[in-house]
């Protein structure tokens, strides 16, 4: 017995306070002292503003937050304790709706012609071919120009007939796409 009293702080310890006169009931949603307390049919205690908000945010699934049993405005019982200043039923009044707070927009500064897309870049294209394919056809990505007759290695002469054929096919394909 003495060991049990030492574990929970003795007869005057913090765990003995729960059964005493200063005991309070806690809401099972906000875990604070229940204000305008109501008890569900399944026996769980809530603040009426907390339970009302719970029921309003889940109109299609009205269930007890603890045990998931069916719950509604009609299935809760208000608690009236000693020293209660408000003897009226808390279910009859709806808690006030909180005011919305809009934060001020951030100023990014600088010129942004198409707005700030967060690092997103848009490329216009038709089908699977964006119009940027001309940069690869005309070697715009290559920083150095080759001189006439420069050999790039075995099998890659500077003016091969494959380059001309591919350029012709690319231009033909582009105009074919425009004609459709």
Curated annotation (Swiss-Prot):
<dbReference type="GO" id="GO:0070534">
    <property type="term" value="P:protein K63-linked ubiquitination"/>
</dbReference>
<dbReference type="GO" id="GO:0006511">
    <property type="term" value="P:ubiquitin-dependent protein catabolic process"/>
</dbReference>
<comment type="subunit">
    <text>Interacts with PXN. Interacts with JKAMP. Interacts with STING1; the interaction of endogenous proteins is dependent on viral infection.</text>
</comment>
<dbReference type="GO" id="GO:0009617">
    <property type="term" value="P:response to bacterium"/>
</dbReference>
<dbReference type="GO" id="GO:0044390">
    <property type="term" value="F:ubiquitin-like protein conjugating enzyme binding"/>
</dbReference>
<dbReference type="GO" id="GO:0016020">
    <property type="term" value="C:membrane"/>
</dbReference>
<dbReference type="GO" id="GO:0070936">
    <property type="term" value="P:protein K48-linked ubiquitination"/>
</dbReference>
<keyword id="KW-0833">Ubl conjugation pathway</keyword>
<dbReference type="GO" id="GO:0031648">
    <property type="term" value="P:protein destabilization"/>
</dbReference>
<keyword id="KW-0496">Mitochondrion</keyword>
<protein>
    <recommendedName>
        <fullName>E3 ubiquitin-protein ligase RNF5</fullName>
        <ecNumber>2.3.2.27</ecNumber>
    </recommendedName>
</protein>
<feature type="transmembrane region" description="Helical">
    <location>
        <begin position="118"/>
        <end position="138"/>
    </location>
</feature>
<feature type="modified residue" description="Phosphoserine">
    <location>
        <position position="84"/>
    </location>
</feature>
<dbReference type="GO" id="GO:0036503">
    <property type="term" value="P:ERAD pathway"/>
</dbReference>
<keyword id="KW-0597">Phosphoprotein</keyword>
<keyword id="KW-0007">Acetylation</keyword>
<dbReference type="GO" id="GO:0016567">
    <property type="term" value="P:protein ubiquitination"/>
</dbReference>
<dbReference type="GO" id="GO:0004842">
    <property type="term" value="F:ubiquitin-protein transferase activity"/>
</dbReference>
<keyword id="KW-0808">Transferase</keyword>
<comment type="function">
    <text>Membrane-bound E3 ubiquitin-protein ligase that mediates ubiquitination of target proteins. May function together with E2 ubiquitin-conjugating enzymes UBE2D1/UBCH5A and UBE2D2/UBC4. Mediates ubiquitination of PXN/paxillin,thereby regulating cell motility and localization of PXN/paxillin. Catalyzes ubiquitination of Salmonella type III secreted protein sopA.</text>
</comment>
<keyword id="KW-0862">Zinc</keyword>
<dbReference type="Pfam" id="PF13920">
    <property type="entry name" value="zf-C3HC4_3"/>
</dbReference>
<keyword id="KW-0863">Zinc-finger</keyword>
<dbReference type="GO" id="GO:0031966">
    <property type="term" value="C:mitochondrial membrane"/>
</dbReference>
<feature type="region of interest" description="Disordered">
    <location>
        <begin position="79"/>
        <end position="110"/>
    </location>
</feature>
<keyword id="KW-0812">Transmembrane</keyword>
<dbReference type="GO" id="GO:0061630">
    <property type="term" value="F:ubiquitin protein ligase activity"/>
</dbReference>
<feature type="modified residue" description="N-acetylalanine">
    <location>
        <position position="2"/>
    </location>
</feature>
<dbReference type="GO" id="GO:0030163">
    <property type="term" value="P:protein catabolic process"/>
</dbReference>
<dbReference type="GO" id="GO:0005886">
    <property type="term" value="C:plasma membrane"/>
</dbReference>
<feature type="modified residue" description="Phosphothreonine">
    <location>
        <position position="94"/>
    </location>
</feature>
<dbReference type="InterPro" id="IPR045103">
    <property type="entry name" value="RNF5/RNF185-like"/>
</dbReference>
<dbReference type="InterPro" id="IPR001841">
    <property type="entry name" value="Znf_RING"/>
</dbReference>
<keyword id="KW-1003">Cell membrane</keyword>
<dbReference type="GO" id="GO:0042802">
    <property type="term" value="F:identical protein binding"/>
</dbReference>
<keyword id="KW-1133">Transmembrane helix</keyword>
<keyword id="KW-0256">Endoplasmic reticulum</keyword>
<dbReference type="GO" id="GO:0010507">
    <property type="term" value="P:negative regulation of autophagy"/>
</dbReference>
<dbReference type="GO" id="GO:0044877">
    <property type="term" value="F:protein-containing complex binding"/>
</dbReference>
<dbReference type="InterPro" id="IPR017907">
    <property type="entry name" value="Znf_RING_CS"/>
</dbReference>
<dbReference type="InterPro" id="IPR013083">
    <property type="entry name" value="Znf_RING/FYVE/PHD"/>
</dbReference>
<feature type="modified residue" description="Phosphoserine">
    <location>
        <position position="107"/>
    </location>
</feature>
